[in-house]
């Protein structure tokens, strides 16, 4: 734990790498990648605010989350890696605290406002409709979610947030705040970062080939904030690049962390 955020560490030597998960995720989503990188690095898995074992907030705020992550880094600059929502947190942390971030990897997200109508509204509605008071088992929860969320892998991802405490089931994540603040999470705090300088360090921008989160017309905005950016597309991967192509992500990250061109 540091500044209230829950963390797990893999590896005991080498430079530091901090991994930030996406919406509805937890640090442990990156465990496979962390274990592979831990042969040469100290890897920190973070549960972001309102997720996993980290504290809840009253409203989701990208700048506040970025400040909390920067506090983890302290006086030793680290490589910061973030996926989706965690990628936006990582980008803002690098812009607001450039002295704390040695290099940055942004996975399948851009510093832009995304349109309404994403699948996450459906996820939130289905999770809110689940009657936790009468729920008996996790398998029952899976069955009840299946009409609204047909993909078993997505249900399994969401249900990792379901915890049993005694006889009572509860969501470990802050479902109400995350659901109410989806517009904020889809957004980009342009006004809040407008006065900040571009990040001077190297940046790796990883896109999933089958994902539409990174578009060609996002490049100019990305280059405005991160002039040393290099883009890599992972073939066959959708939005959850690190889960779908972990070996490729590990190799790309190893090269980037070693200072080599990952292009």
PLM segments and residue spans:
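Active-site glycine-rich loops that stabilize anionic/oxyanionic intermediates
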Residues: 22-25, 84
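Conserved alpha/beta-hydrolase catalytic His-Asp/Glu region
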Residues: 133-187
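Flexible "cap/lid" loop of the alpha/beta hydrolase fold
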Residues: 92-95, 102-136
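Conserved serine/cysteine hydrolase catalytic core
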Residues: 167-225, 230-233
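Catalytic active-site module of serine/aspartate enzymes centered on a nucleophile-bearing elbow/loop
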Residues: 227-263
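Active-site loop/oxyanion-hole signature of alpha/beta-hydrolase fold enzymes
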Residues: 5-6, 31, 35, 44-82, ...
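Gly/Ala-rich beta-loop-alpha elbow adjacent to hydrolase catalytic centers
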Residues: 82, 86, 90
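Serine-hydrolase catalytic-loop signature spanning alpha/beta hydrolases and amidase-signature enzymes
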Residues: 24-32
């Amino acid at each position: 734990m540091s500044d209230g955020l829950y963390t797990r560490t893999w590896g005991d030597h080498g430079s530091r790498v901090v991994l930030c998960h996406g919406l509805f995720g937890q640090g442990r989503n990156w465990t496979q990648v962390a274990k592979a990188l831990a042969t040469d690095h100290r890897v920190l898995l973070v549960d972001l605010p309102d997720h996993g074992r980290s504290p809840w907030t009253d409203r989701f705020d990208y700048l506040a989350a970025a400040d909390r992550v920067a506090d983890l880094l302290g006086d030793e600059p680290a490589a910061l890696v973030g996926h989706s929502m965690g990628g936006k947190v990582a980008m803002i942390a690098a812009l607001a605290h450039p002295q704390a971030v040695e290099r940055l990897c942004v996975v399948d997200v851009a510093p832009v406002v995304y349109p309404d109508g994403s699948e996450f509204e459906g996820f939130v509605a289905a999770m809110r409709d689940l009657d936790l008071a009468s729920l008996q088992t996790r398998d029952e929860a899976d069955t009840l979610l299946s009409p609204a969320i047909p993909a078993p892998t997505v249900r399994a991802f969401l249900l990792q947030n379901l915890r049993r405490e005694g006889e009572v089931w509860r969501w470990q994540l802050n479902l109400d705040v995350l659901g109410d603040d989806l517009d904020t999470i889809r957004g980009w705090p342009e006004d809040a970062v407008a006065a900040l300088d571009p990040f001077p360090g190297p940046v790796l921008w990883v896109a999933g080939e089958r994902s539409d989160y990174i578009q060609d017309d996002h490049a100019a905005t990305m280059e405005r904030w991160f002039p040393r950016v290099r883009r890599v597309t992972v073939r066959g991967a959708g939005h959850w690049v690190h889960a779908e192509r972990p070996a490729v992500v590990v190799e790309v990250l190893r090269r980037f962390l070693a200072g080599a061109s990952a292009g």
